Amino acid sequence: MNTFGHFLRVTTWGESHGRAVGCVIDGFPAGLEVDEEFIQREMERRRPGKKYTTQRKEVDRVEILSGVFEGLTTATPISMVVWNVDADSSAYESLKTVFRPGHADYTYWAKFGVRDWRGGGRASARETAARVAAGAMAKLLLRRYDVKVMGYAKEIAGVSCEVDDAEKAFERAERSPLRMPDERAEKEAEQRLKEAMSEGDSVGGVVEVVAKNVPAGLGEPVFGKLDAYLAYAVMGIPAVKGVEIGAGFEAARKRGSENNDPIVLKDGRIRFATNNAGGILGGISNGEDIVLRAAIKPTPSISKKQRTVDYEKMEEAEISVKGRHDPCIVPRAVPVVEAMVALVLADCMLMQGLIPRSLL
């Protein structure tokens, strides 16, 4: 499956060390003014080559090939391409016949009998550049309806941040090399990350995304629940191993009286005094902030020696992965999780009839 969505459908294509990665967006409404500078800023947030990220230096300049005329969307498929300019496959030559632990090398081979050994091919996080490009278009659409999607690193290397105000946290995190909004936590996480790097190892963490001003009523009962759709979207991101919404697994440790969000009247509107539900009840948005967290595993490409198998010789082997890899993928995962949340919300608003096919 390379296509995602219902009314708003996104197909991504391309491999890590191929000529390019890209996406085609179908079902996008006509008449939206396309802010290409905004799209490029979103790409910059995910782009490699920064502190604590892989030193693969990709420009990640998006080219819009179709679906936009004189600065406006035309309701025809929007095709976007990002050219790969700094792929170096030489470090993978020695890995042609061995599987890297923690990667999809073995499972792709087991399923298809063939795999692109250059940087993970289609399974590489390089594919997420296309998701961020598509997500930027979704954010531009949501912005028209005052819906904001903001993310930050909630936890890295076991060090968690305290967050009271999502908008302030987002602003602070954007100035942080680790995208952490808490300076104290950032310093401690940075120290743990450096320790792991010195040992040829890597660390994981948690991304938190908050969507504000989401209207009540998004999502469908039973099998079309908004929280299920969000989890499906985010779990499809490479390195994501878990998703929770609102109180999440902490709800299992609460009593009903603690977990239930009291319903109140505020300025003549029905609201909720707390938000343990994370903005979703019965699979349908309730008008409060959507709060989602994604667990990101440690980067599996590490120089520390690991056991594996050489499948040509059919014998056990030892592997030390060389090349340019992120010691922690969490900071660059933030805009990717945001992108998938934005695509889901835009799709649901189209399904609900809150966004027309033409904005003109």
Curated annotation (Swiss-Prot):
The keyword Manganese does not apply. Its EC number is 4.2.3.5. GO terms for molecular function: chorismate synthase activity; FMN binding. NADP(+) binds at R46. Pathway: Metabolic intermediate biosynthesis; chorismate biosynthesis; chorismate from D-erythrose 4-phosphate and phosphoenolpyruvate: step 7/7. Keywords: Amino-acid biosynthesis, Aromatic amino acid biosynthesis, FAD, Flavoprotein, FMN, Lyase, NADP. InterPro entries: Chorismate_synth, Chorismate_synth_AroC_sf, Chorismate_synthase_CS. GO terms for biological process: amino acid biosynthetic process; aromatic amino acid family biosynthetic process; chorismate biosynthetic process. Reduced FMN (FMNH(2)). It catalyses: 5-O-(1-carboxyvinyl)-3-phosphoshikimate = chorismate + phosphate. Its cofactor is FMNH2. GO terms for cellular component: cytosol. It comes from the Archaea. It holds the Pfam family Chorismate_synt. FMN binds at R122, A123, S124, G282, K297, P298, T299, P300, S301, R324. Belongs to the chorismate synthase family. HAMAP family: Chorismate_synth. This reaction introduces a second double bond into the aromatic ring system. This is Chorismate synthase. It comes from Archaeoglobus fulgidus (strain ATCC 49558 / DSM 4304 / JCM 9628 / NBRC 100126 / VC-16). The lineage of its organism: Archaea, Methanobacteriati, Methanobacteriota, Archaeoglobi, Archaeoglobales. The gene is aroC.
